Amino acid sequence: MKRTYQPSQRKRSNKHGFRKRMATADGRAVLARRRAKGRKRLTVSDEPRHKR
């Protein structure tokens, strides 16, 4: 049986990235909430990328 989580950087960025969040009013609200809370990483785009 195939596992449900098949990680891919591109899909992750496209679905949960900064530009996707900024594209809608609700997404901007998410960012505002995370800023207010003091999150170190607002979106998955802010996470360090690992060199392969």
UniProtKB/Swiss-Prot annotation:
Bias category Basic residues: which stretches?
1-22, 31-42
Q: Where is the composition biased (Basic and acidic residues)?
A: 43-52
The lineage's top-level taxon is Bacteria
Keywords recorded for this protein, A-Z: Ribonucleoprotein, Ribosomal protein
Any one GO CC term of the record: ribonucleoprotein complex
Enumerate the transmembrane spans: none
- Where are the residues of the annotated region Disordered? 1-52
Q: Which GO terms describe its molecular function?
A: structural constituent of ribosome
Which Gene3D superfamilies is this protein grouped with? 1.10.287.3980
Biological process terms from the Gene Ontology for this record are: translation
Which Pfam family would be a valid example here?
Ribosomal_L34
InterPro entries xrefs: Ribosomal_bL34, Ribosomal_bL34_CS
Q: Which family does it belong to?
A: Belongs to the bacterial ribosomal protein bL34 family.
Which protein is depicted? Large ribosomal subunit protein bL34
Give the source species. Answer: Amoebophilus asiaticus (strain 5a2)
Q: Which gene does this sequence derive from?
A: rpmH
